Structures are given as C-alpha cells and as structure tokens.
Amino acid sequence: MNRDGKGVYKEENRKPTLPFFFKLLWRKLSQLIRLNLMLMVQAIPILVLVYVYLAGYKTATATEMLYAPLYGISKIAPVGGITALLDTQSIQMGIPIFTPVMLIVLICLGVLLAITFGWFNAGSAYVLRGLFRGDPVFIWSDFFYAIKRNLKQAFFMGLLDFACIAVLVSDFIFFYSRTGSSYGNDVMYLMIFAISIVYVIMRFYMYQLMITFDLSTMKILKNSLIFTILGIKRNVLAMIGLLLLIVLNAVFIVMFLSVGITIPMVLPLFYIMAVMGFITTYAAYPVIDKYMIAPYANDNVPEPTEETEASEISDKE
C-alpha cells in the first residue's frame, strides 16, 4: 500500500517546539497544498461574498436611531442645540445595494456555505491532526472519513460556528464604523474585538475536540473556552503566526502589484488556508494531549471524575 506522505521518523524528537514547527511544515508542505486545493471549494463562496460586499455599489445610510427624529426637528426648528446634537448622530455606514438576481445568488451561496461549513472544518481538522502527529495520511479518504464519522455533529457545529462568525463580523463592521461617535460605541467596539479574539482561539480547539473525543457540543465549546486560558502561551504564538502570515502575504501582493506583477495575488490560494490550519493545530493539539489524553493514557491512572468531564470522553481515533 502506498502512503500519502511519510509517517513518524524513528528516534526523532517530536517535541512541538518552534524550530520543529518549521521543520514539520516544510516536510508536509506538499500535502498541505493538496489539502488547500480541497478547501478552495469552501473558500469560493466566501471570496464571492467578500468581493461583492467590497466592490459592489453602496449607499451611505445613517445608523444612529436618533438621526431621523433629530433631522426632522432641525428642519422645523433649526436651533443651535439641535443642530449640534444632529452632528453627533450623523455617522453614516455604506450599505450594499443588490439587484434581486444578485441577492438570490448571494443567499444561495450563503446557505451552501453554512450547510457545508462544519463538514469542511471537520475533514480538514482530521487531516491536519494526522499530519501533526506523523500518522500515515491519505488526504482524500481521511478527509471524507472524518466527515462521515462526524456527519451530524459537524453539521450542527458548523451552523453554530457560521452563525457566531457572521454575528461577530457584522457587529465588528457596525461598531467600527461608529467609533469616535460616543463612549458607548467605543466600549462596544472594544468588547466585540475582545470577544472575536477569544472566539478565534476557541476555534483552534473546537473541531480537534470533536474529531478526537465523543463529547457533546456544549462540552466542546466549554472545553475550548477553558483551553484559551490553559494554552495561552501557544495560543498567543499561534495568533502572532497567523497575523505574520497574513501581513507577509499582503505585503508581497502590494509590492509586486506596484510593478505590474499579479502572481502573488494567486499564490496564497494554493496554501494559505491549509497553512493557517496547520499553525492552529500545531498550537492546539499539544494542549489537548496534555490535559485530556496523556493523564489517562496509563491504565493505572484512576478513572476521571465528573468534575473533569473526562468521564464522557471516548477516543474517536
């Protein structure tokens, strides 16, 4: 049987340090590229939605609830106090304008993305876990094996995940457009920003926990939140790595576009999603192993209690 990539190297020190990350990344790069090409099927609706929002026609719309009544009062009684108050409530936000056909297409793309979101994440999480652990990995078959094994839970987890991301992104855009208008809006913007960071880190663990253990969705979310603290060192390094990856790609695109070269705009489509997933898996799985696998690997260790919630853990491997 031919293996899709190499397994564990004998006598190799696989301690998940920063130097070993680059060594393993280089070793698994070809497999990550193949995985990324599969993930592009999921990325196409996202790219279309982002492009339509950024490039489509927008109309400036006032977002403050007091704007309309204050505007009416200012027309009837244009006194200085009302005019000054109206100025503070005149923050505008660009609202996209869609034709009926375009709106139907976007809704269909959004529904398709929401339905398949959890399945793609479950499949990629399983493959990335295998690449990190040095298991023999068959990209195509392992990807769909994970989806089949977690079909129902991945579907509902994906819907919940997609809804949370959609709410956080829309809230972030909304309150970002209103920063500086009032103290309350500034506080809400900072809160949404902080919650978004926490949720991004939770996503490092959510699908890894789902494919590895037999846990309820609520326990997965709870443990993922706990791991944002327990693995804070690795989580921060992973966030820095993701930020550097995005910034470096953006810099290269801008640099080459300035001289008329468009290739850097296409190259990230071949690797960036899988590499980002590899970074998060490299950060998250050692934390999961430390707290949920290693303590119970020895048969002599007492059975876990309800307090640790590990009594409900059953390895899916």
Predicted segments with their positions:
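Membrane-interface helix termini and inter-helical loops of multi-pass transporters
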Residues: 174-181
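Alpha-helical transmembrane segments of multi-pass membrane proteins
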Residues: 187-196
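Helix-coil boundary and N-terminal low-complexity module in membrane systems
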Residues: 1-173, 185, 202-204, 209-239, ...
